[in-house]
């Protein structure tokens, strides 16, 4: 999912804590602040479906299925080395790393993920 990097890019990362649904556990989660990268990224205009459109498409169907796309973005590989380098983050005492998969917080992640699903 991540690999050591020599990228010219570097974004700050930090740890936040979140409650686990249904459990009384608090789990740490690493977060990378991609705000500056997102500010200069051209938005991908791939359409994201809305609930009403999806329900209209299901009208008259006899069978339904359900997929759990847990951590879906992390299932999608970043194809180009250039894009991987843009995801580089600096972790205290661990050095510089970059993602090999689409990270959360990346501006075009939802559109890219939807394109793969479609």
What does each of the following model-derived ranges do?
Residues 1-118:
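Retroelement reverse transcriptase polymerase core
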